[in-house]
Amino acid sequence: MSTAKKFEVLFVLGGPGAGKGTLCRYITEKYGYVHLSAGDLLREEQTNLDSQYGELINRHIKEGTIVRVEITCSLLDRAMQMSDNPHKRFLIDGFPRNQDNIDGWNKVMSEKCIVKGVLFCDCSKEVCTERCLNRGAAGSGRTDDNEEVLAKRHETYITSTLPIIEHFEKQGAVYKVNSMQAPDKVFEEAKEILTEIGW
């Protein structure tokens, strides 16, 4: 891929219910970049009857645990390759979620992508939980929007994903937004960050 333009990637991280998907939707509507949700790709693959990974993904989602990085990276890679977006700029939400994810990404994707940094949706556990439960009650159709799985997901976020955010922070590559605000306010903060990274 040395002659072709590399994909540019901004990871979007935060706890479950921090507003990652909502913020990505605002950004894609304004700028035309591509939003790839690792969770959505896994949920789609889970329902694909031809997928060799469906059963395995289903088990991880129900238990609130992290799917093997090879699976997630292959789904992200496929989605980026299939995209006809002229910008070649991707918001990847909900990934990387642990050190294994970073190692796997570096092994498989580092030749194809330039990582611009992490857009960190900073939100309290209480607000995150309330949003997810409201989303579940409103019929999100997500099997992981219930209190029991949410507790596990939040625990996984604290133990596995927060250290990843700290890892990028040491490189000066974390851009924080206060995602406890209304979505349009969060978006205003994000626009300044996008200008800063040259997007």
What kind of region is each of these model predictions?
Residues 1-199:
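Glycine-rich phosphate-binding loop of ATP-dependent small-molecule kinases
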